[in-house]
């Protein structure tokens, strides 16, 4: 395949339609700077799919459209068409000629065509992928690309070999696979989160459903036997009721007779008991006074014994502390003396150290190298001066010889010599001006390059920092998004349970699901109470099933809803009509006393909130329940028997008013209605906060990306400006070098001509010149003699100084050893002093403490002495009072004994009458109770059949168990016990479990499919990595071999190698370059000179083209950094290489131009508009031959 032509219209400076036909061989494109040569290369890159605006030296894509000039208006479209000869079907299309067209309109629209057929940019990219002709391939080699090769890090340089290996397609496939893997993993994580949440629901629901089914089975059996029990009880009760009614009439008459006799005896007995009660009251008061006085006497005597024992203990402690104080004061005196001795010793040792340090410093100065260096420097100066005088001696000798020679020559060339000198001086002045101008330009450009390079480095560092921050922000966003998704899944599951009222009884659930039909229904208690987190469990336990009570406005509303449940056979529910419910509260005094008990947090009704209209409901439910922190405190309150209320702890234990204790734990304590509601609220709040954080992360991420994008544009602009500055600097340096070379030649010419003129004019003063020369030679000889004497003196001083220094060094070593010993003694003394000071301070503190304790004991003893006298007085007074009270009590007991005898006799008579009356009354009441009981049993059984089972007695008798009533009752007890053990069940859990299980199984299957897909993607990535590594290694070996061969050709010898920085990891290993140009050592590319690096980099690019030939290659001033000799080698290699590759070269170098077959010149005859002219150098070469 060959590049056949390029047609440009409206692209950058090519305003007019321009067509460039390319021939086989080497095509050169030349022209002055700014004429538009590089626009041709950019047009080729653009039409082949380049999308990076900065690579096209623009800020936006529409910058490639001709923007107008002084004489032309801007165009609205840029169009580039590139045509290939595809007769060898290099491109995978069935066309002998392939043309690719790209159009861009100023409104931003784009068109892409292949052989005039509309296509996508992706189609063009895919057509060129791995052909070596893509927008980023090595078919286009610029000076910047050459610099990138030798400036790149080894890890960046590996992309060159990857391009040769043709692994772009595989890496693109891997990138696509990685994206799919990330999506699959993300989706799998979300599915697993939902599965985990469903699994958490599934376990409790399965248990609830199982319990519900068991409950239904046992409930059916229970209802059947209960109906049979009611029918049998009703039949028996009717038969017994008839006999009881007859006995009841006889018993009533007998009760009236005995009651009259009892009433008369009761009046007399009441009078005696009144007297007895008064006497008993007086006795009790006297006994209480006597006991109180005895208690006072005993307490006072006991306290006297305790006080005596305390005084003895205090006196013993006082003696012990006094002895300890004396010992401590002795220790303080000893340690104070020791401290003084140590301070004196330390002062003496520090003085010795100071003296020895002064001696060491003095000897150190004496033995320093400064003196030796001063003598060496002086000797070196004398030698340099001696050598300078020797050079002067040689010059004087030459001058003398020249004087003789020039004196012998005479000439008539003075006039011609003067003209030549004037012309040379004029030329020198002109070149000097040019050199000054170029010097200034070079300094300015170097400063600009340095500043621009610093700016670029700073911008690149900021881009890297921003990229790291973007990665960190991206990771934080992903972590937050994943966490939020998991929380949302939990919230959705909880909301689904709440919306379906899954955890409510069937009847309650039916009412809540149809509440819109009943305007008076406020909701379930669990929905209407607001409970602080710390009390949730306590309130939930305290209310239990009452949380599912339904609050409504009136009894009529409750009746309407009850009828609704009956009609739909939807279960039962308990209703709390606001108009009828009365608040229940503890008495004010009881509530006040209860609040002061340890551990009491408050009455439950006052710790929760609700609407004001529901206050009575709240207090009805919780007004007599107190919340306590721990079970121990609750048990203590219950034992006091002062508070008749229900106690509930924070952990859910309860103590009833009767004293019954309930507690423990179940596996699903956190599934309560209130706890689920609070969990949903907390999760919703967390999700809202996470969403806010995500928005913040997204905004921060967008800001970072925008800032980095802007900064990247700035970096590219700076890099482009830097490249342009370097180009200008290279040109200026070349111009300066040429001017300096010319300046040097002209300076030499002026000096030579001036000297000739001076010699010609000096013939008249030949004798004077010879005399001066002889005088100068004599002075020179004297100076040489003087320098020789001074050098001998300095050398002797050096010898003496070495001997003196050796002696002083020995002394210095001895003094340093002594200093070290003294310093160690000082440290040891300081440690002893610090230890002594610490011990002394500790003893002082001990002394203060002992003194404080002694003072406290003395105060206590004085106080106790005063208390002894007071207690003696109290004891005497109490004993006297107790004797008087005891005498009064004995008198009262004698009077009470007489009354007791009278009461006893009359009571015996009254008891006998009462027994007779009571027996008659008991018979009557027993019969009456039997009547009431039997009537109640009949009514209750009839009502139960109607209310529970909606049956009449006749209908119930149609289906009765054949078991006897005791057997039925026993079985009912067993069934009731089973139902109680099951407890409250959620009948809706059966359907909910089936729904959750179905979704759980479905998602499990999905998770298995996703896991299998993930493993397949991982295997695909591993296969792609293997393919990339294999192709990379093969391409590397081939390029390395060609590189070594071509290096010898390009450098005319030497050797070079490509090496892998990490051969064990082919997927990440960098590529380093080692080179040894002729006459140099084997070293890294970065250590070579600039020209050697450039030529080595070009050699590597040629090696790449040799391994993977491309139909054509475009070189954009790739050889700009080479000298003339290397440019010739470069051009010659292109001639040898072009048999298989077509080359298009943009160049300024004459050596390159000479080897081109066709030259295109780019000019700007009209400002801002590029034109093309061409000439066939091959034809010219043939004509010249």
UniProtKB/Swiss-Prot annotation:
SMART domains: SMC_hinge (SM00968)
Pfam families per the UniProt record, alphabetical: SMC_hinge, SMC_N
Membrane-spanning ranges: none
Residue span of region Disordered: 300-323
UniProt similarity note: Belongs to the SMC family.
Quaternary structure, from the entry: Homodimer.
UniProt name for this protein: Chromosome partition protein Smc
């Amino acid at each position: 395949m060959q590049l056949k032509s390029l047609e440009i219209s409206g692209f950058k400076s090519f305003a007019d339609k321009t067509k460039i036909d390319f021939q086989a061989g080497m095509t050169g494109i030349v022209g002055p700077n700014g004429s538009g040569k590089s626009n041709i290369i950019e047009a080729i890159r653009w039409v082949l799919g380049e999308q990076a605006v900065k690579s096209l030296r623009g800020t936006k894509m529409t910058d490639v459209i001709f923007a107008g000039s002084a004489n032309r208006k801007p165009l609205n479209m840029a169009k580039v068409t590139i045509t290939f000869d595809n007769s060898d079907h290099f491109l995978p299309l069935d066309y002998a000629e392939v043309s690719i067209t790209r159009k861009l309109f100023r409104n931003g629209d784009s068109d892409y065509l292949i052989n005039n057929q509309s296509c996508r940019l992706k189609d063009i990219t895919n057509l060129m992928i791995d052909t070596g002709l893509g927008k980023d391939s090595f078919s286009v080699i610029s000076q910047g690309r050459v610099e990138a090769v030798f400036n790149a890090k080894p890890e960046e340089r590996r992309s060159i070999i990857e391009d040769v290996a043709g692994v772009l397609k595989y890496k693109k496939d891997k990138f696509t696979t990685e994206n799919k893997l990330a999506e699959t993993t993300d989706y799998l994580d979300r599915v697993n989160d939902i599965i985990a949440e469903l699994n958490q629901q599934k376990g409790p629901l399965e248990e609830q459903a199982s319990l519900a089914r068991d409950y239904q089975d046992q409930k059916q059996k229970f209802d059947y036997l209960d109906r049979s029990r009611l029918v049998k009880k009703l039949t028996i009760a009717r038969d017994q009721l008839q006999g009881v009614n007859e006995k009841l009439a006889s018993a009533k008459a007998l009760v009236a007779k005995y009651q009259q006799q009892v009433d008369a005896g009761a009046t007399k007995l009441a009078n005696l008991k009144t007297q007895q009660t008064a006497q008993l009251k007086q006795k009790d008061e006297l006994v209480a006074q006597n006991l109180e006085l005895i208690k006072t006497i005993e307490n006072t005597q006991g306290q006297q014994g305790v006080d005596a024992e305390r005084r003895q203990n205090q006196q013993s402690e006082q003696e012990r502390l006094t002895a300890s104080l004396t010992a401590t004061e002795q220790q303080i005196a000893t340690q104070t003396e020791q401290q003084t001795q140590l301070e004196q010793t330390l002062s003496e040792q520090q003085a010795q150290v100071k003296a020895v340090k002064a001696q060491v410093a003095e000897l150190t100065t004496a033995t320093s190298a400064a003196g030796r260096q001063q003598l060496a420097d002086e000797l070196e100066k004398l030698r340099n001066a001696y050598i300078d005088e020797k050079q002067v001696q040689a010059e004087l000798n030459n001058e003398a010889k020249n004087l003789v020679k020039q004196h012998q020559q005479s000439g008539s060339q003075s006039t011609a010599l003067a003209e030549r000198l004037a012309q040379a001086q004029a030329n020198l002045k002109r070149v000097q001006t040019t050199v000054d101008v170029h010097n200034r330009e070079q300094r300015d450009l170097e400063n600009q390059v340095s500043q621009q390079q610093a700016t670029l480095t700073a911008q690149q560092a900021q881009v890297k920092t921003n990229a790291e921050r973007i990665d960190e922000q991206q990771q934080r966003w992903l972590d937050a998004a994943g966490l939020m998704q998991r929380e949302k899944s939990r919230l959705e599951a909880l909301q689904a349970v709440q919306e379906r009222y899954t955890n409510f009884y069937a009847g309650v659930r039916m009412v809540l699901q149809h509440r819109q039909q009943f305007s008076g229904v406020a909701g379930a208690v669990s929905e209407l109470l607001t409970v602080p987190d710390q009390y949730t469990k306590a309130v939930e336990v305290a209310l239990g099933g009452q949380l599912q009570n339904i609050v409504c406005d009136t009894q009529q509303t409750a009746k309407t809803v009850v009828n609704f449940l009956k009609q739909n056979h939807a279960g039962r529910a308990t209703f709390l009509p606001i108009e009828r419910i009365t608040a229940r509260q503890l008495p004010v005094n009881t509530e006040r006393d209860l609040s002061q008990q340890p551990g009491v947090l408050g009455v439950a009704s006052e710790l929760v909130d609700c609407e004001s209209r529901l206050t009575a409901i709240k207090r009805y439910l919780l007004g007599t329940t107190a919340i306590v922190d721990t079970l121990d405190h609750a048990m203590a309150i219950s034992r006091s028997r002062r508070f008749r209320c229900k106690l509930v702890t924070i952990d859910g234990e309860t103590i009833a008013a009767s004293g019954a204790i309930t507690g423990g734990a179940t596996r699903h304590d956190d599934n309560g209605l209130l706890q689920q509601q609070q969990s949903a609220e907390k999760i919703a709040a967390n999700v809202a906060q996470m969403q806010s954080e995500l928005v913040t992360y997204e905004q921060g991420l967008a800001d970072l990306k925008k800032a980095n994008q802007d900064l990247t544009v700035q970096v590219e602009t700076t890099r482009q400006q830097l490249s342009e500055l370097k180009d200008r600097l290279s040109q200026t340096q070349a111009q300066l070098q040429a001017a300096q070379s010319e300046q040097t030649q002209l300076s030499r010419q002026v000096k030579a001509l001036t000297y000739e003129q001076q010699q010609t004019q000096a013939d008249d003063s030949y004798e004077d010149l010879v005399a001066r020369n002889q005088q100068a030679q004599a002075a020179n000889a004297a100076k040489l003699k003087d320098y020789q004497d001074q050098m001998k003196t300095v050398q002797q001083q050096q010898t003496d100084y070495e001997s003196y220094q050796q002696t002083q060094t020995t002394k210095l070593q001895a003094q340093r050893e002594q200093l070290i010993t003294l310093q160690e003694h000082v440290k040891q003394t300081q440690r002893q002093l610090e230890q002594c000071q610490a011990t002394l301070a500790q003893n002082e503190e001990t002394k203060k403490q002992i003194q404080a304790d002694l003072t406290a004991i003395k105060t206590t003893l004085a106080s106790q002495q005063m208390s002894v006298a007071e207690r003696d007085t109290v004891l005497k007074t109490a004993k006297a009072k107790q004797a008087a009270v005891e005498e009064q009590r004995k008198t009262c007991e004698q009077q009470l004994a007489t009354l007791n005898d009278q009461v006893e006799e009359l009571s015996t008579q009254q008891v006998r009458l009462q027994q007779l009356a009571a027996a008659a009354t008991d018979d009557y009441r027993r019969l009456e109770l039997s009547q009431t009981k039997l009537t109640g049993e009949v009514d209750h059984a009839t009502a139960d059949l109607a209310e529970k089972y909606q049956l009449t007695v006749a209908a119930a008798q149609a289906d009765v168990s054949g078991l006897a009533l005791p057997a039925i009752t026993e079985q009912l007890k067993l069934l009731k016990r089973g139902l109680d053990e099951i407890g409250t069940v959620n009948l809706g859990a059966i359907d909910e479990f089936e729904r959750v299980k179905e979704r759980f199984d479905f998602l499990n299957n999905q998770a298995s499919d996703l896991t299998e897909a993930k493993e397949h993607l991982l295997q695909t990535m591993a296969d792609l990595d293997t393919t990339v590594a294999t192709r990379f290694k093969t391409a590397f070996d081939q390029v390395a071999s060609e590189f070594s061969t071509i290096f010898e050709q390009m450098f005319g010898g030497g050797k070079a190698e490509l090496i892998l920085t990490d051969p064990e990891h082919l997927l990440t290993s960098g590529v380093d370059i080692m080179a040894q140009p002729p006459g140099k050592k084997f070293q890294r590319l970065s250590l070579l000179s600039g020209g050697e690096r450039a030529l080595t980099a070009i050699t590597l690019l040629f090696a790449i083209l040799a391994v993977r030939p491309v139909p054509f290659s475009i070189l954009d001033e790739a050889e700009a950094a080479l000298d003339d000799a290397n440019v010739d080698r470069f051009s010659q290699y292109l001639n040898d290489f072009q048999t298989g590759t077509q080359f298009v070269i943009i160049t300024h170098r004459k050596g390159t131009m000479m080897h081109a077959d066709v030259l295109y010149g780019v000019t700007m005859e009209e400002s801002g508009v590029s034109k093309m002219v061409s000439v066939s150098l091959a034809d010219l070469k043939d004509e010249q031959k």
